[in-house]
Amino acid sequence: MAVKKISKVQPERFEFDPKNKQTADRIIQNYPQGKQQSSVMALLYLAQKQNDNWIPLSAMKYIAKYLDMPYIKVYEVATFYSMYNLTPVGKYFFQVCTTTPCMLRGAYNLVEVCKKKISEEENMLSKDGKTSWLEVECLGCLLYTSDAADEITG
């Protein structure tokens, strides 16, 4: 599996829009006093949703300030979990598990299909900008790997 990539093109600023700011405040209120930093995952998801399904570095810095926590802690969470996208993704976004059990069931066939049909490298948008793909850790879909490859390749 490849190292999680950070987009080279980054917006300078990010802040929650008024609706998401209200949502963030409601989320934070669900945590006991002194434990509000535990809402970091929910706020990262909210930022990703607001920013076309990816999280720029400026959003991580904003969330760190919003939660009064070190930026590196937000960065660690965002880079650890595959549910957070750190590069722009297409409307159609494929995640392919390439851990050993899935590899044995044909996951690399799916990777080859993605390379041919979407883009040569993961984390890159297709030529039309609508589709992207990424290698990830286990998705819990081991039974479907070869079926998916057959369905995609015809």
Listing of model-derived features with the role each one plays in the protein:
Residues A2:
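Acidic, Mg2+-coordinating active-site segments of isoprenoid diphosphate-utilizing enzymes
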Residues I6-L46, N51-F94, T98-S146:
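Ferredoxin-type iron-sulfur electron-transfer modules in oxidoreductases and energy-metabolism complexes
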Residues Y144-D147, E151-G154:
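Single conserved hydrophobic/aromatic residue that forms the stacking wall/gate
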